[in-house]
């Protein structure tokens, strides 16, 4: 029987290993995602973000880093989390079903050249999948943060989209990597805007 201290230590060790494994495959696609976002934002586009549960919190976290700041002062950047308007979410969910709570907002707010960030640890969240389909209808780019094998989301992405798939089976480790990816993207964007990298 393990002690609570051993369990906590095991979480740290597994989290470190998961990040190291993800880092082996996700550095280049993360840079691609940041460059795609920069291109969108510099052309007066916007970024929409969505997810469920912890992924909804990540979508909101990302939007806050864009509209406010990450670590350094810079201009405000156009990003909206589609997870925050309870009136829209409940009205759409009630009238059209939960699978459409994000896609209806994407169709209302998204324009060609904008970006949808879809976050799903399983890669199989039906409402995120519908949002991606809606984004493609609007000629938007998609940046998908997924886990495990990428799920159904990986299969519907276009060549012009970016897949950031964390190859780990545990939801907690995937979520920890997703927030790391979000922070890395924010840092890349700030580095280009503030330092001309």
Curated annotation (Swiss-Prot):
Predominant subcellular localization, coarse grouping: cytoplasm
Keyword Transferase belongs to the record: no
Pathway info: Carbohydrate biosynthesis; D-glycero-D-manno-heptose 7-phosphate biosynthesis; D-glycero-alpha-D-manno-heptose 7-phosphate and D-glycero-beta-D-manno-heptose 7-phosphate from sedoheptulose 7-phosphate: step 1/1
Binding site for substrate: 52-54, 65, 94-95, 120-122, 125, 175
Reaction(s) catalysed by this chain's protein: 2 D-sedoheptulose 7-phosphate = D-glycero-alpha-D-manno-heptose 7-phosphate + D-glycero-beta-D-manno-heptose 7-phosphate
Gene Ontology MF annotations: carbohydrate derivative binding; D-sedoheptulose 7-phosphate isomerase activity; zinc ion binding
Domain SIS: 37-197
One Gene Ontology biological process: carbohydrate metabolic process
Cofactor requirements of the protein: Zn(2+)
Subcellular location: Cytoplasm
Alphabetical UniProt keywords: Carbohydrate metabolism, Cytoplasm, Isomerase, Metal-binding, Zinc
Residue sites binding Zn(2+) per the record: 61, 65, 175, 183
Similarity comment: family membership: Belongs to the SIS family. GmhA subfamily.
Something else known: The reaction produces a racemic mixture of D-glycero-alpha-D-manno-heptose 7-phosphate and D-glycero-beta-D-manno-heptose 7-phosphate.
Function: Catalyzes the isomerization of sedoheptulose 7-phosphate in D-glycero-D-manno-heptose 7-phosphate.
PANTHER family registered for this protein in UniProt: DNAA INITIATOR-ASSOCIATING PROTEIN DIAA (PTHR30390:SF6), SEDOHEPTULOSE 7-PHOSPHATE ISOMERASE / DNAA INITIATOR-ASSOCIATING FACTOR FOR REPLICATION INITIATION (PTHR30390)
Protein name per Swiss-Prot or TrEMBL: Phosphoheptose isomerase
Upper taxonomic lineage: Bacteria, Pseudomonadati, Pseudomonadota, Betaproteobacteria, Neisseriales
């Amino acid at each position: 029987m393990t002690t609570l201290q051993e369990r906590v230590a095991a979480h740290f060790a597994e989290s470190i290993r998961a990040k190291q494994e993800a880092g082996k495959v996700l550095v280049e696609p993360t840079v691609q995602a940041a460059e795609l976002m920069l291109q969108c934002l510099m052309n007066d586009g916007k970024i929409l973000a969505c997810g469920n549960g912890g992924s909804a919190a990540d979508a909101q976290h990302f939007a806050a880093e864009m509209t406010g700041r990450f670590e350094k002062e810079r201009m405000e950047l156009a990003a909206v989390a589609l997870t925050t308007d309870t009136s829209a979410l409940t009205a759409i969910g009630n009238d059209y079903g939960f699978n459409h709570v994000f896609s209806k907002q994407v169709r209302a707010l998204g324009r060609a050249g904008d970006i949808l960030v879809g976050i799903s640890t399983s890669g199989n969240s039906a409402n995120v999948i519908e949002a991606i389909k809606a984004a493609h209808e609007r000629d938007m780019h998609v940046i998908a943060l997924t886990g495990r094998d990428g799920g159904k989301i990986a299969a519907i992405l276009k060549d012009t989209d970016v897949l950031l798939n964390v190859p780990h089976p545990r939801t907690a480790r995937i979520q920890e990597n997703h927030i790391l990816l979000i922070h890395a993207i924010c840092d890349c964007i700030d580095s280009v805007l503030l330092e001309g990298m």
